[in-house]
């Protein structure tokens, strides 16, 4: 009971330490610094900066959070708020470089190495904050989060994002790399501030005490903050879904910009700042003749805390040790054994209560094989497609890993080719870097090559070609224009080693190549290349575009195209509508029906200008159906639930509905709330997720036949959809993923995400609420209705983040991506291979 009281007290304490308007972000900044260091390659003369930072993690981690230390009112009654503000901007970095060069010439002693490591942590914080808060730039993380989830209210999105980012970090990541000691170079900081201000502006006591408060806050976050996941998941689906991957201010992007500022800082430490352009905003610093014409503007961060820490200080004690130039903070352990034991015991009890000690026969928990990578953060399986690439009559697998990095080359991305045979894909575990049949690699810094893939005969020479999306090309220039590369195939079954066709976009933030599709758009029976760019301006902000290039024999082996010259194009209706987030093509009466999802679309047509913001439903979502080359949509399907995001996923096929073979379209609304009943009690499952099934006919708009729903809060049931005939009966099975599903019903208070994928037999589909007609006393019941339930072999792996099937001689194999798996390396991703049914 005492442990429970302490946990409750910690949650209350964090509410005081990080109230509304607080900067916070301690866990987030430490995670960014950790990722930036992973692939840093920075040797300057005799100094290997990666080794230096690894040696002095105590200083590096403390520095990555230090700029926010004087914001809280609990810190000396807030009188040094402006000192924190100044620590976020270029003049502080300039003063630090001058101070180090003047006082500590090479070779550096250990204290100076720690000072440099601390400074590198500060610079990571600087550039991360610019992108996260949209300081002097547009469409950074929090600005977009405000537009999507908070009726465009940045003041509401700001505290939810700052503190919510820490909640999400602690819920999703393991901080086993966290140093038990932090070092703050207090004496040197006094000197740097004197250099910056020309006078004494802060005391050593304030530096030590306020930094120590951050150390305490980190301790509190490690113990309890993850238990607030349900609260912040409800506040912002965007935060949960885009926290790592969002192109401008997501974790991956902030880590990329951290490595950039590290190179600039090392240059200045060696050469001084005379050959550098030093605008106020650190994101736009250039050195050595580089040019950057966009300097942005300085925008104040701001933030306040309330005054409560006594309970926490009493519990962990004050472990502070002074040295000649600095101070060490230490903790015996970042977790309390009693709390850890309590969490695990409760998790086991709840798990047994809800799922029992044995699994139903329909549950499949072990894949036939797993394909992995040995490098972290690769996002293996982010995009997948299947086709007979080598023309041997068997299905092959194409899989993207857009987060793939080398030392010094972060997020260049890769695409892997795995060939099948008469038995299907290899049914042994594979390290794809060593055993894939083919590898293509991106060549642009942080271009995220492999974010989308499609196979088609683009040059109409009779052999398949491969199109690859790299939507973050241009990131180093802050343009994020993106690119699509087409690699021609050959009659020998090999792909070109370099792209034959490059398609570019001129618009800033175009993110060209976010989604790709092969579909016959012009009616010549040859698949064409369809490109979705949901973040593209489209004449506004993130309206999104869908563009098609017709296949033809006129393309040369070194073709340069621009998306503005596409053969067919449509644009989103509203700002932040994200048209093209999902794409799907289906043949209806010998015509291609092209479907485009716009999951963050909202209906503003019936509201006057003055009342649009607060009265509109956020992100009900919409799907557009086109019969190209006509650009006017033939039909639209609109969501009716706020935050439902209808159109996030799309798929089609043929199933038996009440005994009649029917062509159907499935549309996912993975963040739609679901009504659940437990006996006579009714509750709302926030973001449980729903999937609609429509009948497709040649002469009329799609008509709703059935719905499927998830049975856990936040599970995002329907986030990924796929239809494929798994048993050769001429009917497609319906495959529905719930990648964020949590086994227990507390939705994050106990346990982790474990993800599930449901396979519904195509012969047994009924009209109406399929998962609501249950034998048990709990509804919905997707597990009761599914023929198979694939269980994640690893907690927290986002099992079901992508799904595809590959045809072998006898039956299809099901490939499930777990994009956050750490099977091969931390958060690298994995592919699980399943062969369902009796062999």
Swiss-Prot record:
Biological processes per GO annotation: cell migration involved in sprouting angiogenesis; cellular response to cholesterol; cellular response to insulin stimulus; cellular response to pH; cellular response to triglyceride; cellular response to xenobiotic stimulus; chondrocyte differentiation; complement receptor mediated signaling pathway
Post-translational modification: Glycosylated.
Enzyme class: hydrolase
Originating species: Bos taurus
Record protein name field: Phosphatidylinositol-glycan-specific phospholipase D
Purpose of the protein: This protein hydrolyzes the inositol phosphate linkage in proteins anchored by phosphatidylinositol glycans (GPI-anchor) thus releasing these proteins from the membrane.
EC nos: 3.1.4.50
Sequence ranges of the FG-GAP repeats: 365-427, 434-496, 498-558, 562-622, 632-692, 703-769, 787-839
UniProt subunit comment: Monomer.
Keyword set, alphabetical order: Glycoprotein, HDL, Hydrolase, Lipid metabolism, Repeat, Secreted, Signal
GO annotation, cellular component aspect: cytoplasm; extracellular matrix; extracellular space; high-density lipoprotein particle; intracellular membrane-bounded organelle
Record flagged with keyword Repeat: yes
Signal peptide interval: 1-23
SUPFAM superfamilies found in the cross-reference section: Integrin alpha N-terminal domain
């Amino acid at each position: 009971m005492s442990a429970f009281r302490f946990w409750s007290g910690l949650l209350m304490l964090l509410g005081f330490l990080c109230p509304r308007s607080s900067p916070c972000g301690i866990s987030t900044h430490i995670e960014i610094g950790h990722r930036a260091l992973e692939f840093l390659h920075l040797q300057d003369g005799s100094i290997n900066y990666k080794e230096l930072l690894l040696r002095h993690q105590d200083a590096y981690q403390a520095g990555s959070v230090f700029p926010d230390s004087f914001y809280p009112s609990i810190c000396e009654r807030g009188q040094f708020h402006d000192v924190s503000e100044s620590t976020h901007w270029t003049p502080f970095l300039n003063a630090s470089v001058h101070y180090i060069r003047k006082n500590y010439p090479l070779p550096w002693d250990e204290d100076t190495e720690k000072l440099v490591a601390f400074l590198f942590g500060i610079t990571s914080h600087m550039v991360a904050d610019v992108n996260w808060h949209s300081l002097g730039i547009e469409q950074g993380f929090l600005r977009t989060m405000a537009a999507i989830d908070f009726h465009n209210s940045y003041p509401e999105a700001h505290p939810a994002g700052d503190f919510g980012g820490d909640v999400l970090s602690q819920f999703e990541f393991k901080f086993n790399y966290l140093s038990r000691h932090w070092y703050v170079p207090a004496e040197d900081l006094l000197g740097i501030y004197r250099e910056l201000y020309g006078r004494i502006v802060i005391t050593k006591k304030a530096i030590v005490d306020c930094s120590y408060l951050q150390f305490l806050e980190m301790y509190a976050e490690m113990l309890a903050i993850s238990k607030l996941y349900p609260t912040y998941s409800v506040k912002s689906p965007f935060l949960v879904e885009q926290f790592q991957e969002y192109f401008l201010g997501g974790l991956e992007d902030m880590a990329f910009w951290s490595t950039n500022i590290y190179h600039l800082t090392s240059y200045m430490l060696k050469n001084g700042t005379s050959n550098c352009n030093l605008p106020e905003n650190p994101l736009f610093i250039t050195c050595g003749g580089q040019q950057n014409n966009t300097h942005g503007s300085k925008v104040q961060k701001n933030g306040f805390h309330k005054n409560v820490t006594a309970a926490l200080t009493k519990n962990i004690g004050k472990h502070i040790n002074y040295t000649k130039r600095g101070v060490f903070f230490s903790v015996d352990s970042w977790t309390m054994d009693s709390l850890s034991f309590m969490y695990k015991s409760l998790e086991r009890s709840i798990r047994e209560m809800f799922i029992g000690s044995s699994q139903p026969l329909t549950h499949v928990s072990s894949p036939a094989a797993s394909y992995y990578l040995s490098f972290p953060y690769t996002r293996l399986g982010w995009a997948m497609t299947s086709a007979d690439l080598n023309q041997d009559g068997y299905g092959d697998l194409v899989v993207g890993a857009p987060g793939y990095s080398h030392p010094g080359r972060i997020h260049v991305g890769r695409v892997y080719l795995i060939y099948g045979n008469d038995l299907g894909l290899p049914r042994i575990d594979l390290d794809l870097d060593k055993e894939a049949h083919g590898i293509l690699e991106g060549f642009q810094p942080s271009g995220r090559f492999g974010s989308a893939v499609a196979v088609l005969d683009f040059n109409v020479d009779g052999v398949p070609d491969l199109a690859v999306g790299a939507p973050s090309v241009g990131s180093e220039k802050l343009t994020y224009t993106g690119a699509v590369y087409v690699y021609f195939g050959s009659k020998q079954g090999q792909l070109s080693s370099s792209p034959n066709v490059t398609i570019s976009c001129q618009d800033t933030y175009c993110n060209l190549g976010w989604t790709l599709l092969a579909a016959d758009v012009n009616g010549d029976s040859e698949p064409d290349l369809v490109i979705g760019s949901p973040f593209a301006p489209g004449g506004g902000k993130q309206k999104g575009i869908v563009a098609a290039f017709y296949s033809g024999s006129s393309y040369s082996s070194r073709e340069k195209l621009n998306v503005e010259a596409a053969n067919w194009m449509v644009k989103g209706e509203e700002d932040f509508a994200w048209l093209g987030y999902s794409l799907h093509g289906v043949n209806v009466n010998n015509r291609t029906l092209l479907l485009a999802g716009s999951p963050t679309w909202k209906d503003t047509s019936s509201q006057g200008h003055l009342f649009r913001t607060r009265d509109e439903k956020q992100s009900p979502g919409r799907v557009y159906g086109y019969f190209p080359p006509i650009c006017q949509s033939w039909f639209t399907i609109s969501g009716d639930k706020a935050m439902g995001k209808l159109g996030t996923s799309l798929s089609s096929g043929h199933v038996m509905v009440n005994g009649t073979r029917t062509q159907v379209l499935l549309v996912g609304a993975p963040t739609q709330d679901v009504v659940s009943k437990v006996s006579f009690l009714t509750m709302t499952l926030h973001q449980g997720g729903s999937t609609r099934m429509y009948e497709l006919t040649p002469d009329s708009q799609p008509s709703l036949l059935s719905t499927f729903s998830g049975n856990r809060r936040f599970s995002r049931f329907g986030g990924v959809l796929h239809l494929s005939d798994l048993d050769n009966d001429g009917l497609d099975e319906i495959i529905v993923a719930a990648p964020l599903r949590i086994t227990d019903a507390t939705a994050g208070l106990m346990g982790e995400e474990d993800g599930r994928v449901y396979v519904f037999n195509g012969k047994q589909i009924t009209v109406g609420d399929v998962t609501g007609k249950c034998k048990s006393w709990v509804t919905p019941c997707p597990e009761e209705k599914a023929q198979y339930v694939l269980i994640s072999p690893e907690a927290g792996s986002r099992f079901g983040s992508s799904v595809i099937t590959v045809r072998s001689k006898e039956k299809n194999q099901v490939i499930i991506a777990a994009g956050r798996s750490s099977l091969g390396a931390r958060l690298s991703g994995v592919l699980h291979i399943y062969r369902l049914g009796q062999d």
